[in-house]
């Protein structure tokens, strides 16, 4: 069956409107020598059975692997099948927030529940309806801090995700704001003495990872105290959101803004994305928050309803008054996270977080028995750096065994301690005891 949307009469009518005799006349600007004057060399059309057979043949060429031990900002977690089934419902299956949002009460309620989950896990007062990802959420936090404080300097921990820092630099290139990077110490935490020297009266905000890129739970309370004393805001960026089921909420530790990604809830790794970014802050900063907010209200009949409010995007108001130019957010990915968190509940999330930390401890014990000691001494959640001697060689060796190992740290930190051997590894609920032992024994051999 051929799928031609236009009848000959449709084509003739359109050509008449533009004053052309033939379809070829539309391409007169292209030199004749560059035009294809024959049909495309394609194989005959396949029926459905033959097509699926060919797809299975191609899929068989892929190498299957165990759950990867690589994290570095994107983590392997179990996604309950019901998440995808609910996402496929026609009412939800779009990344877009409708231009007439009030007619899509289900979508707005889902975003409202997302905001509720974000606030509960971060200890903040308000959340928006999602961001593109953790990196852009972090950059938007720096822009918001500049608007609030009127300052032009951002102090960033070197242990913040390096790719978050790259996106931040891209955003601030046009504003002219200065970025000062503070080193981390032997424990993998931000060097507080260096941070104290870097923070001054020009500082708009201090940004730390929580946990940071090295897997270490950074010194957020101490950093927040230093920032507060200088009149600056503190931004906590979380790439592994399962940690918030075990760690204290960033808001409880003094952070003014909490950002990051909920990829770990309901969203597969998918070669690094997409994944929903989150942005939460104190109520006093509500009107400076980027994006848009789903709010609850009551109509004339006293019925509860949901609306989009505080949409201070440049699509809605004057550019000079806008807080961001974010367009389509990650609504569908945010819905996946909302469904997953609803299924887990408070107790389930706590159990999942404890299980992740337990598997990380199991990995640490196994790696130490294999002669691979941890590089950093600071507290960790489910990710840590080990000295394996030659990280690149270990990754290549394990790949032959069907194991995707961790990420060689030298890719981002060539001058870090034990850089050549430093391997960043994550362990989640998907990494059972047998797989962890296989990983460690293969590294040792």
UniProtKB/Swiss-Prot annotation:
The keyword Manganese does not apply. Its EC number is 1.4.4.2. GO terms for biological process: glycine decarboxylation via glycine cleavage system; nucleoside metabolic process. It comes from the Bacteria. CDD domains: GDC-P. The keyword Ligase does not apply. One of its GO terms (molecular function) is glycine dehydrogenase (decarboxylating) activity. InterPro entries: GcvPA (IPR023010), GDC-P_N (IPR049315), GDC_P (IPR020581), PyrdxlP-dep_Trfase (IPR015424), PyrdxlP-dep_Trfase_major (IPR015421), PyrdxlP-dep_Trfase_small (IPR015422). It catalyses: N(6)-[(R)-lipoyl]-L-lysyl-[glycine-cleavage complex H protein] + glycine + H(+) = N(6)-[(R)-S(8)-aminomethyldihydrolipoyl]-L-lysyl-[glycine-cleavage complex H protein] + CO2. Keywords: Oxidoreductase. Pfam families: GDC-P. The glycine cleavage system catalyzes the degradation of glycine. The P protein binds the alpha-amino group of glycine through its pyridoxal phosphate cofactor; CO(2) is released and the remaining methylamine moiety is then transferred to the lipoamide cofactor of the H protein. Belongs to the GcvP family. N-terminal subunit subfamily. The glycine cleavage system is composed of four proteins: P, T, L and H. In this organism, the P 'protein' is a heterodimer of two subunits. NCBIfam families: PRK00451.1 (NF001696). This is Probable glycine dehydrogenase (decarboxylating) subunit 1. It comes from Anaeromyxobacter dehalogenans (strain 2CP-1 / ATCC BAA-258). The gene is gcvPA.
């Amino acid at each position: 069956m051929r799928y031609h949307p236009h009848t000959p009469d449709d084509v003739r009518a359109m050509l008449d409107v533009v004053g052309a005799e033939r379809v070829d006349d539309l391409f007169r600007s292209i030199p004749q020598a560059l035009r294809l004057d024959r049909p495309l060399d394609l194989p005959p059309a396949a029926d459905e059975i033959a097509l699926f057979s060919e797809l299975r043949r191609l899929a068989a060429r892929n190498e299957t692997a165990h759950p990867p031990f690589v994290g570095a900002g994107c983590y392997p977690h179990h996604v309950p099948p019901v998440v995808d089934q609910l996402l496929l419902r026609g009412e939800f299956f779009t990344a877009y927030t409708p231009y007439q949002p009030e007619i899509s009460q289900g979508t707005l309620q889902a975003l409202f529940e997302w905001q509720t989950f974000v606030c509960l896990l971060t200890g903040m007062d308000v959340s928006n309806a999602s961001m593109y990802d953790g990196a852009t959420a972090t950059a938007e936090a720096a822009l918001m801090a500049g608007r609030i404080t009127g300052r032009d300097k951002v102090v960033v921990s070197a242990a913040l995700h390096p790719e978050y820092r790259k996106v931040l630099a891209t955003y601030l290139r046009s504003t002219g704001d200065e970025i000062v990077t503070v080193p981390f110490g032997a424990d993998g935490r931000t060097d507080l003495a260096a941070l104290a020297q870097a923070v001054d009266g020009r500082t708009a905000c201090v940004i730390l990872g929580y946990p940071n890129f090295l897997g270490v739970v950074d010194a957020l309370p101490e950093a927040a105290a230093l920032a507060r004393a200088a009149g600056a805001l503190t931004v906590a960026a979380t790439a592994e959101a399962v940690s918030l089921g075990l760690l204290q909420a960033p808001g409880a530790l003094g952070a003014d803004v909490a950002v990051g990604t909920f990829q770990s809830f309901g969203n597969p790794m998918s070669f690094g994305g997409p994944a929903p970014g989150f942005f939460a802050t104190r109520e006093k900063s509500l009107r400076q928050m980027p994006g848009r907010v789903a709010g609850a209200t009551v109509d004339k009949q006293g019925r509860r309803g949901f609306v989009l409010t505080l949409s201070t995007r440049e699509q809605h108001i004057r550019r000079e008054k806008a807080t961001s130019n974010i367009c389509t957010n990650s609504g569908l990915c945010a819905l996946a996270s909302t469904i997953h968190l609803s299924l887990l509940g408070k107790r389930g999330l706590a159990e999942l977080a404890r299980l992740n930390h337990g598997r990380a401890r199991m990995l640490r014990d196994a790696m130490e028995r294999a002669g691979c000691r941890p590089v950093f001494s600071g507290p960790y959640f489910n990710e840590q750096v080990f000295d394996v001697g030659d990280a690149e060689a270990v990754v290549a060796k394990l790949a032959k065994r069907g194991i995707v190992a961790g990420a060689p740290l030298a890719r981002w930190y060539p001058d870090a301690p034990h850089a050549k051997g430093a391997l960043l590894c994550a362990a989640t609920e998907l990494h059972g005891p047998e797989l962890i032992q296989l990983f460690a024994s293969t590294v040792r051999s």
